[in-house]
Amino acid sequence: MSDILDRIIAVKREEVAAAMRSAPLEALKLEASARDLRDFVGALRAKHAAGHAAVISEIKKASPSKGVLREHFVPADIARSYAEHGAACLSVLTDEQFFQGSVRYLEEARAACTLPVLRKDFIVDAYQIMEARAMGADAILLIAAALDTPLMQDLEAYAHSLGLAVLVEVHDRNEMEQALTLKTPLLGINNRNLRTFETSIQTTLDMLDMIPSDRIVVTESGILSRTDVDTMRAANVNTFLVGEAFMRADQPGEELARMFF
């Protein structure tokens, strides 16, 4: 399979250049100043303190590897359902070309509930972080496979200066070493290889020995059943980012409750 991540990153750079021309940074700053912030990390820790799994429930219409996951796709309804059934936070895809996401989906989801929201996209430039703040995101994703360490550190510092939480995502031990240079407590381990889109939940388990106790491990991708959840919780992994399993269910929120609670 061709290197999907490289293709996505090339498109992102083109998108950023176009967006900078159409919406200057100063305009985004004005929009951002009108947005409140919700405590993303705090919401996860509150679930842990209550003895529950903390689930970042994803709103995702499609993916490059699986195609369309959900035909009947109403982000506000999905967000409300997640909130009613125990989600800690939301993750909303805003990438249009590869995941059929939208900024509008994030805005609609956030307006429909009180949960903090992660902008799920491929961040390559500080402009996208101000964009995230302006659209109402409370957290952003930084993907180690797409960024060198100095750039990742700069992007994290900028996000934190705007009050945004940062979830740094890794897939292997080298990327984990890179991620551990950041200040964020949120370490996402993607069980899906973004270069091949192959998935194994063993990826998370194999890296737990590297992680300091003050970090929050978020296992991402490939969590498809209660058995997968139990496997992770037995290894003291209590934070999950789940999309596909919920999106394929008739009632996403009910599937969340069935798998986790």
UniProtKB/Swiss-Prot annotation:
It comes from the Bacteria. The keyword Amino-acid biosynthesis applies. Its EC number is 4.1.1.48. This is Indole-3-glycerol phosphate synthase. It is an enzyme of class 4 (lyase). One of its GO terms (biological process) is L-tryptophan biosynthetic process. Belongs to the TrpC family. One of its GO terms (molecular function) is phosphoribosylanthranilate isomerase activity. It catalyses: 1-(2-carboxyphenylamino)-1-deoxy-D-ribulose 5-phosphate + H(+) = (1S,2R)-1-C-(indol-3-yl)glycerol 3-phosphate + CO2 + H2O. Pfam families: IGPS. Pathway: Amino-acid biosynthesis; L-tryptophan biosynthesis; L-tryptophan from chorismate: step 4/5.
